[in-house]
Structures are given as structure tokens and as C-alpha cells.
Amino acid sequence: MNDGKKFGFTTTILHSDRQKPIEHGSLHKPIHTAVAYGYRDARELADVFQGKKPGYRYGRQGNPTVTALEEKITRMEEGVSTLCFATGMAAIGALVQALLRTSDHVVSSAFLFGNTNSLWQTVDLQGMPVSFVDATDVANVERALKPTTRMVFVETIANPRTQIADLARIGALCRERGILYVVDNTMTSPYLFRPKDVGASLVLNALTKSIGGHGNALGGSLTDTGLFDWSHYPNIAESYKRFAPAQWGMAQLRAKALRDFGGALGPEAAHHLAVGSETMALRIERESSTALALATKLSADARVAAVYYPGLPTHPQHAIAKQLFRAYGGLLSFELKEGFDCFDYLNRLKIAIPASNLGDTRTLVIPVAHTIYHEMGPARRASMGIAESLIRVSVGIEDTDDLLDDFAQALNA
């Protein structure tokens, strides 16, 4: 596997661990549960702490099992390095903790996962201004920029309404202005899309979703694509400038976010996520094809008011999705027409499960306005296009016909 040949996506993931010798010939990287790491020579321990030699210091800052997962993700995203965190939200929080100051300004897409939106609102309330814009048009992002803008944050496919940011043109704008461009790749995954191709500086993945894919482990990651020039970023502390400039951002993230705030990914979760990632392409192909079939069927039903799925030709950003993504993913949402109660509908489903997660092998559904967006209130929900009857669907890997029949019978009952 080290002869320089470029392999396919799944082959690369499956054999990623073999880039280095694995203990005792194990085919999977073992789970290392140690919190501390001993050295026979105390000077070597000091060298590791001072960054003069590679090695592990304490479980909060690094672990061999987590490192193996980080290296897999780096290869998936074709980046230069990756840091893993306890959750996807911890990874987003790390951006604030390690790379931003209260005098900075952030431009964020207005179309975000509910908890991400809440986090950026909290940041704004604490004194770091955040501008929320319609990121489907780069002009809105450009108008929001200020001399103090340090970061632009977008999701590839917005959860739950599936709006798609003007990814390539925002990337070009950030590159021209020297602004950190953070792209949340969770809804597309590294299999469907590589944000590096549109100029992303950092790529965020909620590993719980498509990468892990089985709903049995939490995790998040940030990948440095190698495209951003950290030597011009004003928020790097002098202590991290002893490394090569290309390493400054991740060195500061590891220390200021992982070490100081403690959002470390545990080795057991890392192992689950790494094993889950091996079937990512197979799962996403199935989820994408079934989601397209379901979206098509729902959009033809007179009892459904609207269907949101990038694979439909009627989707406002269908052309961008078709150009950039390998397929359209397993996330869709739809609204029932007036007179149909979303709770009654969900309760009639026999296969799809009312639950709050995405990217699971099982199909999951949730009444968005009444659960994950309830805290925002009706006015903010309306501004984000969240109707009271909106149902989010995370399509799993069940047999397609079984799912189509399930959603149909719930309408017919």
C-alpha cells in the first residue's frame, strides 16, 4: 500500500491503518485505553511535551486509536492533518475557543443545523459579532464582510431544508480576502464531496453521522486542507510559531481546544467510528438512491405541500449539487398540506423511527419545528423557512420498496 499508487475511496479507508505497522499483526488498530504514556528516559518525555519529538503525553491531547481515525479522515478529505473531538459540536466550539477573539467578526450561513445556529447566536451574545446571511448567493456573504471578518462558516447541504451554499464562489472570495473558510461537510460526507475542491481552509465533519454511520458513537473532526496561509492569520500565539507555518492552526487547536477545554474523543468511540467508516461508500450509495426515490414519490403526492431534496430538478440549487456532488445524500424534508397532522403521520410509520440523529443505518424522522428547532421560537423558525409541519427524514439502508410503501401507507391511513 506504500507504492504511491492512488487507490479508490473505500480501498484507501480499508487499508489506511496499514500505512504504519499495527501491533501484533492486528487488521484493525487496537483500542488503546491508556490515559498516560510512560517513557524510560525522562528527557524524552520532556522533548515530547516541548514538541521536539513526536509522541503521546496525555489522553486529552492524543491517543493512538484516535490518531488512526484522524489519519483516515485526512486521507478521505485529502488534507494535511485532522483533529478529532468528542462531538461535532465540540469541533465547532474549538473554532471559537482556539482561533477567534472577541474583536473578530464571523459570517455564517443562516441555514444551519439547529444546535450550530444556537452556538453562533451564543457567540454573538457574548460579544463576538456574527452575521447570518443567505449563503446560497456569494453576494450576500461579500456584503456582510468587515475589516475584522476572520471566518466564513457554511454547511454543504443545510440541515434540514437542504439549501446549498454557493460553495465555490464563497471559496474564491475567502481566498482573495485571506479569510478562513470553514465548510461543514457532514451532510455530504467526504465520499460525496471534498470541500478542498472549492477552497475550504478547514473541513468539519460530525463523525456520528455518515462517517460512523451506525448511531453508536459520538465524534467530530476538523481537517486542515493545507490551502490556508496561517502565516498571515493574526490570532496565532507566539508559542505555536516555533512550528512550520503550515502547522500553526492545528497546533493551536490541539492545545487551546483539546488540552485547555477538554473536548477529546475517547478511544472506544474512535474505534467504532473507524470501523463504521469502512462501509461509508456502500451505505451512502444506498441512502442516496433511496432518498431520491422517496423524494420523487412524495413530490408527486397531492397531500404533500413541499419536498426539499437536492436531487430533485425543482430544487433551487440542483445545478450546483449536480456539478459538485457524487450523489445527493440521504437527507430530505417535506411539509404536509394543511389538514394533515405531522404527529399523526409520524405515528403511523411502521419502519421509519421518530428519533433525532442523521446518517444512521435506520431511517429516522423528526417533526423539526417541535423538537430540534422548538427553542428558536416561531419568528426565527419562519425566517429560516421552517414550517410547523416540516418533517426531516434521514434515509437509512432499508430496502427501498419497503420505505416507499411505509411513507405511502402513513399518508393513506
Residue locations for each model-derived region?
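Glycine-rich beta-alpha junction loops
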Residues: R18-K20, T33-Y39, K209, G226-F228, ...
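Short, well-ordered beta-strand elements within core beta-sheets of diverse protein domains
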Residues: H272-L282, G329-K337, R392-G396
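Conserved small-domain helix->loop->beta segment predominantly found in fold-type I
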Residues: F261-G263, E285-R286, A291-D360, M376-A382
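Conserved N-terminal alpha-helix of the aminotransferase class I/II PLP-enzyme fold
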Residues: A36, D41-G93, N115-T122
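PLP-dependent enzyme catalytic core of the Aspartate aminotransferase-like
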Residues: V80, S131, P147-R150, F340, ...
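N-terminal glycine-rich, Lys/His-bearing helix-loop that initiates the first secondary-structure elements
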Residues: M1-K53
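Conserved PLP-enzyme active-site core in the AAT-like
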Residues: N2-K5, I13-I22, T82-D301
